[in-house]
């Protein structure tokens, strides 16, 4: 060894691999295990949400006020406990988001006004054709219609309507909280932000499969799910509520409408404007810093266009 000299000793010291501390190697699970934990957590949330709807056994139809009230109770309990699942996921994976869990889930004030208005405006543009059809078929003019919509008595009547509360308030709020705000942060470090946005509807479909059992009819999913990537929950909730109110576009009825050509032009114009305005109205610069991007940076996930 002495014959090697200083240069030889340095060469041996460089070529010898350094042992990693066992504590560092065991501090967090590998990426494969993290993905399994994320998928299992999301699947558990979806099953819990659906299971809460069937806790109350009843022969009454799902639109009966008594059934709706019971389901309100169960889904509100599950939704209020769902952030605990994200907290448990963080502890199991060792991932540190770099921000509070509430901020990560879209509960923040920065950029809240554009996050509430711009996604809803974009969704209304997409529904330009159905909105035109609704106005054409309305027996009253626009002024009288606005008076009816804004009247306090009309709102008081809605707030006592269980089906309206379910479709416009409880379902959008609880579903977006569970299937967007809680699931996206858990899936994003595993799949990346873009694939995570398109993976969430798979779990969302689990929650809506029970409608096929109860009633064979199509129910649209929320158009506003992608806007959670703006870092706010309020946008997806409002868009979800609006889509529930509008329902699926009645294209067949538009084809048989007396004014079908203006209506079809409205449908085409709405889709065209939606595609044209989608990128500028969902620019992350409008909504402030994105907590999900901070999460991806801390986990070393590949960058997405939203975070660049």
Curated annotation (Swiss-Prot):
It catalyses: Hydrolyzes the peptide bond -P2-(S-farnesyl or geranylgeranyl)C-P1'-P2'-P3'-COOH where P1' and P2' are amino acids with aliphatic sidechains and P3' is any C-terminal residue. The chain crosses the membrane at residues 25-45, 75-95, 112-132, 186-206, 233-253, 262-282. Its EC number is 3.4.26.1. Deubiquitination by USP17L2/USP17 negatively regulates the proteolytic activity toward Ras GTPases. One of its GO terms (molecular function) is endopeptidase activity. The active site is at residues 175, 208. The modification N-acetylalanine is found at residue 2. Belongs to the peptidase U48 family. This is CAAX prenyl protease 2. It comes from Rattus norvegicus.
């Amino acid at each position: 060894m002495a014959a090697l000299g200083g240069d030889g000793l340095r060469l041996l010291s460089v070529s010898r691999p350094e042992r990693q501390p066992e504590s560092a190697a065991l501090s967090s699970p590998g990426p494969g295990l993290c993905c399994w934990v994320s998928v299992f957590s999301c699947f558990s949330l979806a099953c819990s949400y659906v299971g809460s709807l069937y806790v109350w056994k009843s022969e009454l139809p799902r639109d009966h006020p008594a059934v709706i009230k019971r389901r309100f109770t169960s889904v509100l309990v599950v939704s209020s406990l769902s952030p605990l699942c994200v907290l448990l996921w963080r502890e199991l994976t060792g991932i540190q988001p770099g921000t509070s869990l509430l901020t990560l889930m879209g509960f923040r004030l920065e950029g809240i006004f554009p996050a509430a208005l711009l996604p809803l405006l974009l969704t209304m543009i997409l529904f330009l054709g159905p909105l035109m059809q609704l106005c054409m078929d309305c027996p009253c003019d626009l002024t009288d219609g606005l008076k009816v919509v804004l009247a306090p008595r009309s709102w008081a009547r809605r707030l006592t309507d269980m089906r309206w509360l379910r479709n416009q308030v409880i379902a959008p709020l609880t579903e977006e909280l569970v299937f967007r705000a809680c699931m996206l942060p858990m899936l994003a470090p595993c799949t990346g932000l873009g694939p995570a946005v398109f993976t969430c509807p798979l779990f969302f479909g689990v929650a809506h499969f029970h409608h096929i059992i109860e009633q064979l009819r199509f129910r649209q999913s929320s158009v506003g799910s992608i806007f959670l990537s703006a870092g706010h929950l309020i946008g997806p909730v409002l868009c979800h509520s609006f889509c529930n109110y509008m329902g699926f576009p009645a294209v067949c009825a538009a084809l048989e409408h007396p004014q079908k050509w203006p209506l079809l032009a409205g449908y085409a114009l709405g889709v065209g404007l939606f595609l044209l305005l989608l990128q500028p109205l969902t620019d992350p610069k409008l909504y402030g810093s994105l907590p999900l991007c901070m999460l991806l940076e801390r986990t070393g996930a590949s960058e997405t266009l939203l975070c660049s």
